[in-house]
Each structure stands twice: as C-alpha cells, then as structure tokens.
C-alpha cells in the first residue's frame, strides 16, 4: 500500500516520502496516528501544497527537543533516595517512571516513555547513566545517583 509520510518514521522515511508499506501497518498505525495518508492523486496534490508547513513543524519539533536536551544535560545529575539493604541492593527497583518523576521535580518535564534504561531497572546504589530519547534523533544523558534512605 502506497502512503505519503507526514512525519519522520524511523527505518521508513522522511516527511513527504512515498513509501510502500503493508496494508495492516498503514491502516492500524500510520493513518490513525496521523503519520501518513494514502497516496492518492488528490492527497499527493494536497500534500505538495502543505509540504512547507509540515517541514516547518518538523523542524520546530526538532528544535524544541534539542532545547529540552540541553536543559536535561544542564542538570548534571539527579539524586533518588530509595530503601536499600546493607549490601547496596535496593528493595525493589528504580524504573523509568521514578527517573521521569525525579527529573520533572528537578525542573525539566520528561515523560516516562522518553527515559531509556539500557540495563533495565536500576537495582543498586550508586551512579548510573540514564539516556533520554526526546525525539527520534535527539538524545540526552544524565547521571542518576541512587542513595539509601
């Protein structure tokens, strides 16, 4: 099924690309979420008229994500207190939600879906590097310090 991409899709294409995708992927994901439209003659003409507007929106989203990434890296580190045993292991774990709440409390609004924990939930005390994916191609790294309560 031929579709026109209205947003950058990782491993698929850029704004304005006409790509051939499976019909289920188009009907169930791309079209309902507003990331693509069917590649009919009318839609192609309509898209060409709106191309500059869509590219400007994509550029604005990228700039906003880069600004947020600069804010996250400017924080330097965030401290999270959690209950821990004598050997430095936590009772429970620090998840993406906990990291997102700590960063938001520090002054930068982050959604838990933007937090990337490469080794899974944090289960030990100490310093941990956490990566944030704020946009498809914008990443930020922050040092999360886990201390015992």
From Swiss-Prot:
InterPro entries: Ribosomal_bL9, Ribosomal_bL9/RNase_H1_N, Ribosomal_bL9_bac/chp, Ribosomal_bL9_C, Ribosomal_bL9_C_sf, Ribosomal_bL9_N, Ribosomal_bL9_N_sf. GO terms for molecular function: rRNA binding; structural constituent of ribosome. One of its GO terms (biological process) is translation. Keywords: Ribonucleoprotein, Ribosomal protein, RNA-binding, rRNA-binding. The keyword Glycoprotein does not apply. SUPFAM superfamilies: L9 N-domain-like (SSF55658), Ribosomal protein L9 C-domain (SSF55653). The keyword Lyase does not apply. NCBIfam families: L9. HAMAP family: Ribosomal_bL9 (MF_00503). Binds to the 23S rRNA. Belongs to the bacterial ribosomal protein bL9 family. This is Large ribosomal subunit protein bL9. The lineage of its organism: Bacteria, Pseudomonadati, Pseudomonadota, Gammaproteobacteria, Pasteurellales. The gene is rplI.
């Amino acid at each position: 099924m031929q579709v026109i991409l209205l947003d950058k899709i990782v491993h698929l294409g850029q704004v304005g690309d006409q790509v051939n995708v499976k019909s289920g992927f188009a009907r169930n994901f791309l079209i309902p979420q507003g990331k693509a439209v069917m590649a009919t003659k009318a839609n192609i003409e309509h898209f060409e008229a709106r191309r500059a507007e869509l590219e400007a929106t994509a550029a604005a989203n990228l700039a906003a994500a880069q600004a947020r990434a600069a804010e996250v890296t400017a924080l330097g580190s965030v401290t999270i207190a959690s209950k821990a045993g004598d050997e430095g292991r936590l009772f429970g774990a620090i998840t993406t939600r906990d990291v997102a709440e700590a960063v938001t409390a520090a002054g930068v609004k982050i959604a838990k879906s933007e937090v990337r924990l490469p080794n899974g939930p944090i289960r030990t005390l100490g310093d941990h590097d956490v990566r944030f994916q704020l946009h498809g191609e914008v990443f930020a790294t922050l040092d999360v310090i886990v201390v015992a309560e």
